[in-house]
A protein has these predicted regions:
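Sec-dependent signal peptide recognition
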Residues: 1-9
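Carbohydrate-binding surfaces of carbohydrate-active enzymes
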Residues: 20, 104, 211-658
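Catalytic domains of carbohydrate-active enzymes, especially glycoside hydrolases
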Residues: 43-68, 163, 314, 390-396
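Aromatic- and glycine-enriched glycan-recognition loops and surfaces
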Residues: 36-54, 76-101, 150-151, 224, ...
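N-terminal carbohydrate-binding accessory modules
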Residues: 18-52, 112, 356
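Active-site-adjacent "subsite" loops/lids of carbohydrate-active enzymes
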Residues: 106, 110-164, 173, 194-219, ...
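Short, acidic/polar
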Residues: 38-53, 149-160, 245, 306-314, ...
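Aromatic-lined carbohydrate-binding/catalytic grooves of carbohydrate-active enzymes
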Residues: 50-88, 112-137, 178-193, 246-260, ...
Length: 658
C-alpha cells in the first residue's frame, strides 16, 4: 500500500470518531437562518419567539468567518459593519434561545474574507493558474492548504468557543470551491502551499483539470483541516456537536435538498430520502441533517420552491431517521412566506409526536451501494438513481451506504442482498464468499473477478434478447429490451437467459433492422463465489431506467429481485409512488409511508389520496397503529408476515408495529 493510499485509508477509518451527543439522543427540529450582514441588529427575543412558536428546537445561525455577529478581538476577523455599537447579537440570540430550550449551532464560513487580509497575507489565498486570486463581491477566496484555514481559523474558533456555550458549530463552503456563486468555474488552486504539497505527494505538478490524484489530494487536505477543527471543538466544548458537509471527524453529516434552474432534468424527488438514508447507514453513529432549502436558486433566494416539495422533503428526512429541517435566507420575517407556512404545521406535528423521531435505525435487509467521495474516481448519478427508484417503486426496504464498514468490525450488519451500480469494491468478495448475494448492474467490472471480461463497448445502441421467458414472467409480452450505452462482454458459461443483439440498420423504414443478428453474448451472468453468488447485468440498467422509465427494465429488475430475494421483507399493493421506509426504534418497528403522487415533471402538487393500502411485513406483530390519522388496524399473521390495511394516505402516514 502506498503512503498516499494509507493516509486516505486512515482518514476514512477515523471518520467514526464521533461522540454520542444530544444530536443522537433528541428528536431534532432544525431551522437554519442564513443571516446577512444587515441582519446583525435583529431582535433576538423576537427570533427566539418565532422559533418557539413553530416548535423548532435547534437554530443554526451566523456566528463568524466572513462576518462576526459578536464583538471579536481576533486580528483579521471582522464584525459585521451593521452590528450596533456595544451589541453582541449572537450572545443575545444564544441567551434567548436557551431560555426557550432551543439549542444554538453557530455557523462559520472560512472560504472567503476581506481584501485587508489578502493584502497582509497573500499566501493564505486561492490562486488561479496565472496567480490571480478569486474575488467575488469584494471577498477573496482562501485555500484549504493555506494559513487562513490552518492557523487563523483556529484562532477565530478558539475565541468563539471560549466566549459562548454553543451547542454546535457548522461550517459552510468548506474547502476549495470549483465554482463561484454565479456558477463560473475558477479552476484549481495553484498557490505555493498547494503546489509544494502536491509535488511532495504525487511527484508532479497540479493538473489543469481535476484528475483522480487531484480529487484525492483535495479530499485529504480538507479532512486534515476537519480533524483539527474537530479536535478543537472537543477540547473546548466537549458537549458541542460538529456539523459539516463531510462524514469524516464530524458528529452530524450535512447535505442539502435544493434546486437550481440549470440543473439537468429529470428532477430528483427522492433527494432528502437519498441523502438521509445514505448518511445514516454509512455512519450509523452520526446524525443526518439534510437542509431543506426553500429558495429556487442563488439568484432568487427570496423566491420559494413549491409548498409540496418542501413538505415532501420534510417527511422523507424524518422517515429515514434524520433531522427535520428548514432553511431561510435572512430572518423569519420573509417576503415569500409560502415555504415557512408549509413547514410550521409539520414542525408542530413532529413536536407533538417527537417520541417516534429519535433513535431510529434502518430495518432494511437490502443494501444499495453508493460511491464514496474519497475514492478519487467520479461516478455518474444516473445508474445509482435508477436503482434507487426501482427499489422504492418496488417497495423493497433498503439501506444506502457509501463505504464497506458494514462488512466486518463494530459496524457489521447482515443483508440478504447487496446491489451495486458502478462502485463494486474488492471487499464485496468477502461478503459474497461468506454466503451473501450480490446484484451488480453496470458495464464497469467489479474490483474482483466474477467472469472473464472480453471487452467493453462504450456506446451500444442495440437490444437485449429474452431467451427464457419462464425466468422473467414480467417480460411475457416482450422479447426485446432497449440497450443504450456501455456494454461489457463477458465469457459465456452455458446458455444465457438474456443475450446481446448488437446495433443494426435504423432507417429508412424499409430497412429497419433487416440485418438484425442474435448473438450468444450473455447480457446477464450468475457465478458462485464461495458460499454466495454474484449476478452481473453488464450494462446500465439503472441509468436507462432513471432516464426513460421503461416498464421492461422495471420488469427485468423485479424478476431478478424475486429470484435473488424470494422472501420479500415487505409486500404491498401500494402505488409505485408511495415511498415506504421500514425502521426500528427500541422494541418497535416503524413503517413510514410517503405519498409522492403530487410530483409531475417540473412540478409538485397536492398528492392524490390513496386508500386501502394492503401491507404485509415480515415478522409476528400483534398491533398496528396509525399516527397521522389515528387508528388501530386489524393485524393477521400469514406465512410469517403480518398483514394489515392502511385505510387512507394523504401526504404521510406512520404505522407503529409491536
Amino acid at each position: 500500500m502506498t503512503t498516499k493510499s494509507l493516509s486516505i485509508l486512515m482518514l476514512m477509518v477515523n471518520s467514526a470518531a464521533a461522540q454520542e451527543g444530544w444530536w443522537m439522543k433528541e428528536p431534532i427540529r432544525w431551522v437554519q437562518t442564513n443571516l446577512r450582514q444587515t441582519d446583525a441588529g435583529l431582535d433576538a427575543a423576537r427570533l427566539a419567539g418565532q422559533l418557539a412558536d413553530m416548535r423548532a428546537n435547534v437554530v443554526l445561525m451566523g456566528m463568524g468567518g466572513i462576518a462576526a455577529y459578536y464583538p471579536t478581538a481576533v486580528e483579521f476577523h471582522y464584525a459585521s459593519p451593521n452590528l450596533p455599537a456595544g451589541r453582541d447579537m449572537f450572545g443575545d440570540v444564544l441567551r434567548e434561545a436557551h431560555a426557550r430550550q432551543i439549542r444554538v449551532v453557530g455557523r462559520f464560513d472560512f472560504s472567503k474574507t476581506r481584501q485587508a487580509v489578502f493584502d497582509a497575507h497573500p499566501e493564505w489565498f486561492f490562486r488561479q493558474t496565472g496567480g490571480q486570486p478569486v474575488i467575488y463581491n469584494g471577498l477573496y477566496s482562501t485555500c484549504i492548504n493555506g494559513g487562513y484555514y490552518r492557523g487563523q481559523a483556529m484562532k477565530i474558533l478558539s475565541e468563539a468557543l471560549d466566549k459562548y456555550a454553543v451547542d454546535g458549530l457548522f461550517f459552510n463552503m468548506f474547502g476549495n470551491q470549483s465554482r463561484d456563486y454565479s456558477g463560473r468555474p475558477v479552476g484549481l488552486c495553484h498557490c505555493d502551499s498547494c503546489q509544494r504539497k502536491y509535488r511532495q505527494l504525487y511527484h508532479k505538478d497540479i493538473p489543469e483539470t481535476p484528475d483522480d490524484d487531484y480529487r484525492k489530494f483535495m479530499f485529504t487536505s480538507s479532512r486534515e483541516v476537519a480533524a483539527a477543527i474537530g479536535d478543537l471543538i472537543r477540547e473546548k466544548r466537549p458537549q458541542a456537536g460538529y456539523f459539516n458537509y463531510i462524514q469524516e471527524y464530524t458528529d452530524g453529516i450535512m447535505s442539502e435538498s435544493n434546486t437550481a434552474v440549470a440543473r439537468p432534468l429529470p428532477l430528483w424527488p427522492y433527494s432528502a430520502s437519498d441523502h438521509v438514508n445514505r448518511a445514516r447507514n454509512s455512519e450509523p453513529g452520526k446524525m443526518a441533517i439534510d437542509l431543506n432549502m426553500q429558495f429556487v436558486d442563488y439568484w432568487w433566494r427570496f423566491a420559494t420552491v413549491p409548498r409540496q416539495e418542501i413538505a415532501l422533503r420534510a417527511w422523507q428526512s424524518m422517515a429515514n431517521g434524520g433531522a427535520l429541517t428548514f432553511e431561510v435566507n435572512g430572518t423569519l420575517d420573509l417576503q415569500d412566506r409560502q415555504a415557512l407556512e408549509t413547514v410550521k404545521p409539520i414542525f408542530r406535528w413532529a413536536a407533538a409526536h417527537e417520541q417516534y423521531y429519535a433513535g431510529q435505525s434502518s430495518a432494511a435487509r437490502v443494501l444499495l451501494l453508493g460511491a464514496p467521495s474519497g475514492s478519487g474516481r467520479t461516478f455518474g448519478e444516473e445508474p445509482y438513481r435508477g436503482l434507487f427508484r426501482l427499489l422504492s417503486e418496488e417497495h423493497v426496504p433498503f439501506a444506502v451506504a457509501d463505504n464497506m464498514d458494514w462488512v466486518s468490525g463494530a459496524k457489521q450488519r447482515e443483508f440478504d442482498l447487496v446491489i451495486a451500480a458502478d462502485w463494486a469494491p474488492a471487499e464485496l468478495r468477502q461478503y459474497v464468499e461468506s454466503g451473501g448475494k450480490l446484484l451488480l448492474a453496470s458495464a464497469h467490472a467489479p474490483e474482483f473477478e466474477v467472469a472473464q471480461v472480453v471487452r467493453t463497448e462504450s456506446d451500444v445502441k442495440g437490444y437485449v434478447r429474452v431467451r427464457d421467458h419462464a425466468a422473467f414472467p414480467s417480460l411475457k409480452d416482450t422479447d426485446l429490451l432497449m440497450l443504450n450505452g456501455p456494454f461489457t462482454e463477458v465469457s459465456a458459461d452455458g446458455a444465457a437467459a438474456l443475450t446481446l443483439i448488437p446495433p443494426s440498420l435504423i432507417g429508412p423504414p424499409e430497412l429497419v433492422h433487416v440485418d438484425m443478428k442474435d448473438t450468444n453474448t450473455p447480457a446477464m451472468v450468475t457465478r458462485q463465489l464461495g458460499k454466495g453468488s454474484v449476478t452481473w447485468i453488464p450494462w446500465n440498467l439503472g441509468g436507462m431506467y432513471y432516464l426513460h422509465s421503461l416498464p421492461a427494465h422495471a420488469g427485468l429488475f423485479r424478476d431478478v429481485m424475486d429470484r435473488l430475494n424470494p422472501r420479500r421483507q415487505l409486500r404491498t399493493n401500494a402505488h409505485p409512488l408511495v415511498e415506504i421506509a421500514l425502521m426500528r426504534q427500541g422494541g418497535r418497528t416503524l413503517l413510514h409511508l410517503i405519498n409522492l403522487s403530487g410530483h409531475s415533471q417540473t412540478g409538485y402538487f397536492p398528492p392524490v389520496q390513496m386508500k386501502d393500502i394492503q401491507v404485509e411485513v415480515a415478522g409476528d406483530f400483534r398491533t398496528a397503529t396509525t399516527v397521522r390519522k389515528p387508528g388501530n388496524l386489524t393485524v393477521k399473521t400469514v406465512g410469517g408476515h403480518s398483514r394489515f390495511t392502511v385505510p387512507q394516505l394523504l401526504d404521510y402516514e406512520l404505522v407503529i408495529l409491536k
